[in-house]
A protein has these predicted regions:
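Extracytoplasmic gate region of multi-pass secondary transporters
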Residues: 31-32, 209-261
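Central cavity-lining transmembrane alpha-helices of secondary-active solute carriers
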Residues: 54-67, 251-263
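Conserved MFS/SLC helix-loop-helix module at the cytosolic interface between two early adjacent transmembrane helices
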Residues: 61-99
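Structural signature of the two symmetry-related core transmembrane helices
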Residues: 77-92, 275-290, 368
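Cytoplasmic helix-loop-helix junction between adjacent transmembrane helices
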Residues: 105-142
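Helix-loop-helix hairpin linking two adjacent transmembrane segments in secondary transporters
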Residues: 130, 139-185
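C-terminal transmembrane helical hairpin of 12-TM major facilitator-type secondary transporters
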Residues: 268-317
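A late C-terminal transmembrane helix in Major Facilitator Superfamily
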Residues: 326-357
Length: 390
């Protein structure tokens, strides 16, 4: 492959992986809208219902292992198979005769989800050449849109077929995998196969200068994200007493988040990864503080700013991880995604606990102040590596 080809942005390939991300994540978002029906069908307690989501996310703990494996085989295999291997268990949720089968189906879907999300950014990075940020933005937009459309698809399927009979929707996932196989067999890069016998520990040692500051950024950013993504409708309802406004606030936050995701990666190709993260993680705490303290249309504008800046950080961090991967691109992404999962899971519980003690308004102010603490860790991130470096 020529140097020019490596530098080219392969639009068709990047769009194909983004479409795969969209289709895959539509299926993986089925659980939340189906949960009330599953609770009723199987007479589940709320504790059992909550554990279903946890079981689906447990495989995220082995993301580094999946990445380690993906660096040794062709990453196309994971990406081509993922839509069907996630579609099948998620489409069978309504058929599950008991809680144990439900747990098995969701754990299988969680494994498939990890097996897609760890290597997919590696392929996007290869297809994006020198414009990795732009590639990651397009890839992440597919996932963000799926989170909006997926619940509607699940409800529509159950409305038409009924809960026990909506399983034929898995066919779309199967067709998507066949389509991806046809596309990537012809045009995709083979994926970098790591032939060395290095261990996961070796991979961590080579990546820790990147992962330690990134982990700290994920934690401090996580307080802001956990506060808003989980408790925004509750906060707005407490402030205004208007449930319609509460729901609309989350839609505004997510919509401007999608815009941020779509634009931030390309911005980081021109401004640099660290500079873009600095802009985002100065803008987000300022926006959250102002949102909490103001009223009326100014508050709406501050929510837009917060959504745009806070959610825009993910494609930039994905591009940064791939640039710094040092021959272990999937392992690097596996570590990043594991840290992201751990930070997100733990912090939502902490945010809920603080909100019980101090109220949501004070929790939002505290989260914004903690968000500012991410800034020194952004300055600790390694700079852009030269193409020839190893």
């Amino acid at each position: 492959v020529s140097e020019r080809k490596k530098a080219d942005f392969q639009t068709a390939g990047v769009l194909a992986v983004a479409v795969a991300h969209f289709i895959h994540d539509v299926y993986s978002s089925f659980l939340a809208p189906l949960l009330p029906l599953l609770i009723e069908k199987l007479s589940l307690t709320l504790t059992q219902a909550g554990f279903l989501s946890t079981v689906m996310q447990i495989p995220a703990l082995i993301n580094p292992l999946i990445g380690h494996l993906a660096d040794r085989v062709n990453v196309r295999i994971f990406i081509v198979l993922a839509p069907v291997t996630t579609a099948v268990p998620m489409s069978l949720l309504g058929v599950a005769p008991n809680y144990a089968v439900l747990l098995i189906l969701l754990f299988a879907a969680g494994l498939s989800t990890s097996a897609f999300h760890v290597p997919a950014p590696v392929m996007v990075a290869e297809l994006s050449g020198s414009r990795k940020g732009r590639g990651m933005s397009i890839f992440m937009t597919g996932g963000e849109l799926a989170r909006t459309v997926g619940p509607l698809c699940a409800v529509a399927a159950v409305s038409v077929f009924g809960l026990p009979r909506f399983y034929p929707v898995m066919v779309v996932g199967g067709l998507a995998s066949i389509w991806l196989f046809a596309i990537f067999r012809r045009s995709a890069p083979p994926g970098k196969v790591q032939s060395s016998r290095s261990s996961i520990l070796d991979s961590w040692r080579s990546l820790q200068k990147l992962m330690l500051p990134l982990g700290a950024i994920l934690v401090f950013r996580g307080f802001m994200h956990g506060s808003l993504a989980t408790f925004l409708p509750t906060f707005v309802n407490q402030e205004t007493g208007n449930i319609w406004l509460a729901g609309s606030a989350l839609t505004v936050f997510e919509a401007f988040g999608v815009a941020g995701v779509l634009l931030a990666g390309s911005m980081s190709d021109h401004l640099g990864r660290r500079n873009t993260l600095l802009i985002s993680l100065i803008g987000a705490p300022v926006g959250l503080l102002a949102f909490t303290l103001t009223e009326g249309w100014l508050r709406v504008a501050m929510l837009m700013l917060t959504g745009f800046t806070l959610l825009s950080t993910t494609p930039v961090m994905l591009a940064l991880v791939q640039e710094q991967a040092r021959g272990r691109p999937a392992a690097a992404n596996g570590f990043f995604m594991m840290l992201s999962f751990l930070a997100r899971s733990a912090i939502v519980v902490v945010v809920g606990y603080v909100a019980d003690l101090a109220g949501l308004r004070n929790t939002y102010l505290l989260s914004a102040c903690l968000g500012i603490l991410a800034i020194p860790f952004i300055l600790m991130l390694p700079g852009k590596r030269q193409p020839g470096s190893s």
